[in-house]
Amino acid sequence: MPGTSVSDLSTATAVDAPALLPLPVARPSAPAVVRGKLYIKTHGCQMNEYDSAKMADVLAASEGLELTDNPEEADVVLVNTCSIREKAQEKVFSQLGRWKALKAGGKPVIIGVGGCVASQEGEAIVKRAPYVDLVFGPQTLHRLPELIRARRESGKSQVDISFPEIEKFDRLPEPRAEGPSAFVSIMEGCSKYCSFCVVPYTRGEEVSRPFEDVLVEVAQLAAQGVREINLLGQNVNAYRGAYGADAGDPAQYADLGLLIRTIAQIEGIGRIRFTTSHPLEFSDSLVDAYRDVPQLANYLHLPVQAGSDRILSAMKRGYTALEFKSRIRKLRAVRPDISISSDFIVGFPGETEADFEKTMKLIEDVGFDQSFSFVYSRRPGTPASDLQDDTPETVKQARLARLQAHISAHAASISQSMVGSVQRVLVEGPSRRDPNELTGKSENMRPVNFPGNPRLIGQFVDVLITEAMSNSLRGRIQLDDSAH
């Protein structure tokens, strides 16, 4: 953020985080005059959730638009799209078709399409759905006010799917906390070009936010009561944030390990997470951060995608199953009880039964706690889309069911093993199942429900786990310090 800095960063190393001088304190912004309503429909990943929140911030600050959960009362209606899954485009046009009626009777509703499908399709969206007013990519959401004004003044649809580096972060308003946990985007894009993935084409290559900018945003959120920070990026552990150049010295670069160490020094931050990471960038510096930083959650999401070296090579992942396991061994040497989740693609073109068995062997060897697993979905324009895919869909679905059942059973055993333990839980709010109870998450991402005073919301509490349910844990607040 222009005009702000963290002083004396020139001596920072991957081992010693720079000593922080007082960071800028977040001051409440003057509330914008409400001049209309905004509806946003979000599909896809946590990065999209973050981007949607920033869209709302930008339009509240500049246009006085207030969020609504009813598109029929909105003056601006946006869909933030995801292109990871098959038929993503058709789902978007189906959504737009339903929204076309919002303009009935000449109502001047602005309809906009953002996100990765917008980046892929661009002008084609307006050609197919001429009632769409705005098409904008993930890197141009900060230009929404300009696009809306241009649309209203010219009467023509506006399309901007350019990749202006990291400019969008420089032009976003001060972050607004909405609860004790917050996402902070630290980088955009991916330069790995896995053969199945559209991200480099829809979000561009890797670009990291400056080190100081990230720290200022975290400090502002902490001053508003945020206690847990989740650092976001398509390939978050490739982060290389520049610092030091303002003092006239050549820029230096902070990796994710150093960023975590420094965030841990910010008053109020009690837990740090990050997602999503790539095994190629899982460095010793990051392992050392797990060793040294107690605020770093005892949980890691590290997508492996497959356990067969032949399939990993076809996916262009850049590592073998043995190399992946080596990284996990290093991590467990410093965090023996860490929970690890992963992503898996089943039925990648050319996957044989032997290949799939190697994936199952890897799952058994690593002991994954949770997974996001899917049957391979062909994405047009990616190298993998040209590969011959002759595995029957029924076989793919059977493999997926077997993989998911195995990981679910292991996750259930981990949950059961937590009964009788004391877990540190960040209280997020009332439980959805019982408003008289509170809910939060354990370090390994399990929802925990327990009786408690609503005044505890936003605080960390120790909870004695008394029961493991299918998708959550139950417990009671542990008041006896001797339990540690």
Swiss-Prot record:
Q: How does it assemble?
A: Monomer.
Molecular function terms from GO: 4 iron, 4 sulfur cluster binding; metal ion binding; N6-isopentenyladenosine methylthiotransferase activity
Where do the segments described as Disordered lie?
Answer: 428-450
Location of the TRAM domain: 416-479
**Protein's gene:** miaB
Residues annotated as domain Radical SAM core: 176-415
Question: What function does the entry list?
Answer: Catalyzes the methylthiolation of N6-(dimethylallyl)adenosine (i(6)A), leading to the formation of 2-methylthio-N6-(dimethylallyl)adenosine (ms(2)i(6)A) at position 37 in tRNAs that read codons beginning with uridine.
Subcellular location field: Cytoplasm
Question: Can you tell me which residues bind [4Fe-4S] cluster 2?
Answer: 190, 194, 197
User: What is written in the cofactor note of this entry?
Assistant: Binds 2 [4Fe-4S] clusters. One cluster is coordinated with 3 cysteines and an exchangeable S-adenosyl-L-methionine.
Q: Which InterPro entries match?
A: Elp3/MiaA/NifB-like_rSAM (IPR006638), Methylthiotransferase (IPR005839), Methylthiotransferase_CS (IPR020612), Methylthiotransferase_N (IPR013848), Methylthiotransferase_N_sf (IPR038135), MiaB_methiolase (IPR006463), rSAM (IPR007197), rSAM_horseshoe (IPR023404)
Database matches in NCBIfam families: miaB-methiolase, MiaB/RimO family radical SAM methylthiotransferase
Q: What is this protein called?
A: tRNA-2-methylthio-N(6)-dimethylallyladenosine synthase
A Pfam family matched in the record:
UPF0004
Give the Enzyme Commission number.
2.8.4.3
Its taxonomic path starts at: Bacteria, Pseudomonadati, Pseudomonadota, Gammaproteobacteria, Lysobacterales
Known catalytic reactions: N(6)-dimethylallyladenosine(37) in tRNA + (sulfur carrier)-SH + AH2 + 2 S-adenosyl-L-methionine = 2-methylsulfanyl-N(6)-dimethylallyladenosine(37) in tRNA + (sulfur carrier)-H + 5'-deoxyadenosine + L-methionine + A + S-adenosyl-L-homocysteine + 2 H(+)
> Which HAMAP family does the record match to this protein?
tRNA_metthiotr_MiaB
Q: What class of enzyme is it?
A: transferase
The record ties this protein, via SMART domains, to:
Elp3 (SM00729)
Recorded GO CC terms: cytosol
